[in-house]
Amino acid sequence: MAALDGSFGYEMEIITHPDSGISTIEDIRGKQLAFSSPTSNSGFKAPSAILKADYDMVAERDFEPAFSGKHDNTILGVANKDYMAGAIANKVAVRMIARGVIKKEQIISIFKSQTFPTTGYGVVHNLKPELQTKIRNAFFNFNWEGTSLQKEFEKGNEGQFIEMTYLSL
């Protein structure tokens, strides 16, 4: 997904609630940090790598990890003070605030990563070219107007698919 101006991506943020006493990454030591799931980039892999590389912090040794199941649960858990802190994809929080699920004042960001590319869709190399074209056209010619997808993604200022490519080495 991309914004109408062509910008795309999201950042991993580590959030906390205003009463947590946490204002820096180092303040998480000895406390609980919620992750979404072990397979999530922004909900586990990126924060784990950043915490280890930049802060010498490792789960179990320096903080207690918890898995909420998904970004929404982590955000709700932090906002409702069930978790002291959590690692999230910030676009999810933006949409939850826009829907009125939480109030912006319920969470504070103490860390924001570089921008990561959003989810990519692709086709296998040996798929018939005609079918590859049809799949591509389904994405790029999708009529957003009036759909539930438009309603949801415009809250995060997103509203189009963009072409992505890769670098051959």
Task: For every predicted segment, state its role.
Residues 27-29, 135-139:
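Short amphipathic alpha-helices in soluble, non-transmembrane regions
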Residues 47-53, 77-80, 84-104:
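A ligand-binding cleft/hinge motif common to bilobed small-molecule-binding domains
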Residues 1-2:
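Short beta-strand elements of ligand-binding domains
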